[in-house]
Structure formats: structure tokens, C-alpha cells
Amino acid sequence: MISAASEAVSGNPAPFTWVTGVSMLVFCAILWVIVDYMRTHPRPSMWVWGLALLTFPLWIWGPGRDIGLINWFSWAKILSVLIPLTLVGAMRIAAAEQREGRIWELLRNPRFLWFPYAILFLNIAEATLRDAETGNYWNAAVGLGLCLTIPYCPRFWEVLPGRNAELVAYTTMAWNFLYTTWNLCFTFGGYPPQEEHFAASICILAVAEIYPLVKRRPELYIMARIYTLPVLMLVIAIYNIFPKVMPSDGWFDNDVWIVWGIVNFALTVPYLFWYTWQLETGRAFIHFRRGHAREDFVRQHGDTVEQLMALSDSLDATADTHGRSTRSSTR
């Protein structure tokens, strides 16, 4: 049963006004500064979000408790963002300062990159369950597709050497777009009126999309995303001002919500096939990377990747329609 229409709309339209527009621009500017600061300062990227957990009494007993974390999803979201983000900060410190010790060495191990991968998977899965709970099964299917197409670790993730120790993930432009439109559709119908923040979600997703483009480093998308989301969740948890300063409650339309999910699903299906083909042929090594990251990778590993791609093409060419090798391939 579709329940978002009854849960997400108070019945009082909230038109887009100049106050909403200015509030969104100011929020975007604040998010931009936070993302840029966190990207270049590994230590604060751990301590700020770790200490933010100490505000939890306000989540439970504060003046905004009735308009903040009022359902299981919001509680799961804030905890699955702040706690892991603190550990990601420790990973960056371990790489930036090259500290000694077993724990620091573990945090620097490339295989530990499976941790942020798993957290991203978890965050998408949480929203996917919420989509299914509210009745938008099309958009829930998109969430599942996004989980399945997160680029693998540590092949397409790394913490770059240097004092900034940036966490980068080589996601594709199509994946970023699908994630953005899926998340917006989810936020459009996934929250009750006292907790709604669709306009604010537009801000955090817009900054995550635009920041890497301005920096001409597409691999910073995940990093920008992980540092915009906790800001949103903390505001909601402590005192949710979004329904007042940038109201969007009355924007909801049930038909738009469902059609939006269907369109997202239609875009996801071909991407799943393309993503699988990229991995199978070895083209993902190059095509998932863009800009300078691709140039650097090709310069270091281009010959090896070409050999892998040639091997994949030759294996496809020497197999008959029944999957058996031809005579020439067995000599």
C-alpha cells in the first residue's frame, strides 16, 4: 500500500518563495565551506563528527525532539553516518600522518576501504527499505541497483597519499546521477510533515554534485556526499528548522512520486548491463576514472589494462554459441 501521500503531506501548500530560495543558497554556501574544510583537514574530519555524537541528549530530550528523529529510519541514518564518519577520519589521519602501531597500520590497509564501501551500501539499503515501506517499490528497486553497482574496493577506492589524505571513489557519472535522482525521489515522499526536508536535500545533493565538477575532480563525489549528509542529519536531530526556513511539505504529489520512481528504474536497468559489461571486459579500470585520475592511471597501468581488455575480447571471440572453445583456441 502506498502510504507516502498520507505521511508526507500536511495539506498546507508551501510555495517556493524568495525566503526559501535565499535559505537554500545560504545552506549550500555553508555546506560548500564545510566540505572544502573537511577535505583538506583530516584531523577535524574525525574529531568534529565524533564529538557531534555527544549531542545525542538533545536528540532525545531537546526542544526539537518532536520534529526531529521521529522514526526508525532517521535514527538509523544519523548513527550510520556519524559513527562511521569518525572512523573514516581516523583512516585519513593514519594515511596523512603515517602513524605507527597496529591499529594505524590496519586503518591504512587498502582492504580496510571495504569499511566505507559497506557503510555506503548500508546507507543506500536503509533508504531502500524505507522506500519499500512507504510503497514506492520502483524507487526501492533502484536503490537495490545502486547497491549492486557501487564500484568495488579497493580497486576503485583509495585514500590518497599526502597531508590531505582524501578519500576518493571512482564512481561513474551515471552512478552519481542515478544516486542523486533516486535520493531526491526518496526524500520527496519518505518523511512525515514535521520532519520533511526535501528542499534541504536538494541542497546537500546539489553541493555533492557540483563540488567535484568545480574542482575538476569527479572522484571527490563520495567525499562531498559524506560531508554534506551529517550536517543535514544533525540539524534535524537537534532542532529541525527546515520546515520553517525552507518549507517544501506542500510540494508533494503522489503521481509525480510514483512516476519519478518508474523513470529512475527505467534508467537503472540499462546501467546495470553497462556496469556488468565494463567489469567483465576490464574497461572499468579506465572508464570509471575520469579527468586527471584517468590520465595518471593510464600512464602507470595502461599497457596492463590493454592486455586485459584484449584477453577478454579474444575469449569472447573464441567461444561458440554453446560456450565451447573453438579448435584454434585449444591448439
Model-derived segments and their meaning:
Residues M1-T17:
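Short, strongly hydrophobic alpha-helical membrane anchors
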Residues F16-D36, V48-A96:
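Transmembrane-helix bundle segments that line or gate the permeation/cavity pathway
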Residues G21-L31, K77-A95, F115-N123, V142-R155, ...:
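Hydrophobic cores of alpha-helical transmembrane segments in multi-pass inner/ER membrane proteins
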Residues M24-V33, H197-A317:
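C-terminal transmembrane-bundle signature of multipass membrane proteins
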Residues G50-I67, V88-M91, P116-A132, M173-G189, ...:
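Hydrophobic alpha-helical transmembrane segments and adjacent interfacial helices
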Residues G68-A76, E133-A140, G250-W260:
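Non-cytosolic membrane-interface motifs at loop->transmembrane helix junctions
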Residues R102-E219, R225:
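Generic multipass alpha-helical transmembrane bundles of integral membrane proteins
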Residues L311-R331:
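Long, low-complexity, intrinsically disordered segments
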